[in-house]
Amino acid sequence: MSKNKLSKGQQRRVNANHQRRLKTSVEKADYDDNLFGEPAEGIVISRFGMHADVESADGEVHRCNIRRTIRSLVTGDRVVWRPGKAAAEGVNVKGIVEAVHERTSVLTRPDFYDGVKPIAANIDQIVIVSAILPELSLNIIDRYLVGCETLQVEPLIVLNKIDLLDDEGMDFVNEQMDIYRNIGYRVLMVSSHTQDGLKPLEEALTGRISIFAGQSGVGKSSLLNALLGLQNEILTNDVSNVSGLGQHTTTAARLYHFPHGGDVIDSPGVREFGLWHLEPEQITRGFVEFHDYLGHCKYRDCKHDADPGCAIREAVENGAIAETRFENYHRILESMAQVKTRKNFSDTDD
């Protein structure tokens, strides 16, 4: 009956208690050191619950348990691990992850219930993939750029599907991309279909650990397939008969090696590159062309909107800052406020 139905808040508490009981039962079981070999260096290729796939120095991948003292382990982490020995004839013991090296960077995403969650580590570069289909959205590009600046990870903007552009369309797209080139961002124009522009992209990926970000349908998986080769193909669903756009199928973060050198972490977490956990000041700092004008407004509490004496707005009016970037800045702030309002309402729901 409806009167006995659990509320959302009660359901969350029941699920949380269940997960705590499961975790306690797992942690009670410790591991016998005699079952494992000598410590070795490795990198986490993927994480599955209480297990991780670790790649050793010789390129072999080993399924490992994780020491309960390790509080956080994600794809890209560099670790100390030990291989499992044969416990009995025909029975092999999984390896075990003993320790995690300090991270050079960590990619996170906000979560309504768990706060900020790490999804990948030691990223050198975030490749922001856009395309003219489903639409060329500068707002989405700007959101990713704010995330990159906040995480202090270098961005690379890649515009895919240029084979669909005629001369007029190419001129328009180049004009839009000049907005980013003019403020110091690198932009590459490619086609995963014709493979135009892939060579400069390969060079930009060599020697780095990258992660590809972008909205659904821009061809991230197709682009990765072209770069990785068929032996490492990241599968995509058949193109939708209704929309004509590819469907996203990646379910767990995983690290792949490019044949030309460099690595990529393919992760579904970047689809939800939320910014609502950031403060407005962090969003402002995420627009690099604003930096020279910060602190020069007439009022210290300037909102950089209709405030009198706003140095940033004056720069927009003088053409020193692109109007589209300024508009997207306020769209991001508005969307953050809306999401935080929904989150606060959800948190009070019993």
From Swiss-Prot:
Pfam families: RsgA_GTPase. Keywords: Cytoplasm, GTP-binding, Hydrolase, Metal-binding, Nucleotide-binding, Ribosome biogenesis, RNA-binding, rRNA-binding, Zinc. Residues 1-24 are annotated as: Disordered. Zn(2+) binds at C297, C302, H304, C310. GTP binds at N160, K161, I162, D163, G214, Q215, S216, G217, V218, G219, K220, S221, S222. One of its GO terms (cellular component) is cytoplasm. Residues 1-17 have a biased composition (Polar residues). Its EC number is 3.6.1.-. Its cofactor is Zn(2+). GO terms for molecular function: GTP binding; GTPase activity; metal ion binding; rRNA binding. Residues 104-273 form the CP-type G domain. GO terms for biological process: ribosomal small subunit biogenesis. It is found in: Cytoplasm. Monomer. Associates with 30S ribosomal subunit, binds 16S rRNA. Belongs to the TRAFAC class YlqF/YawG GTPase family. RsgA subfamily. This is Small ribosomal subunit biogenesis GTPase RsgA. The lineage of its organism: Bacteria, Pseudomonadati, Pseudomonadota, Gammaproteobacteria, Enterobacterales.
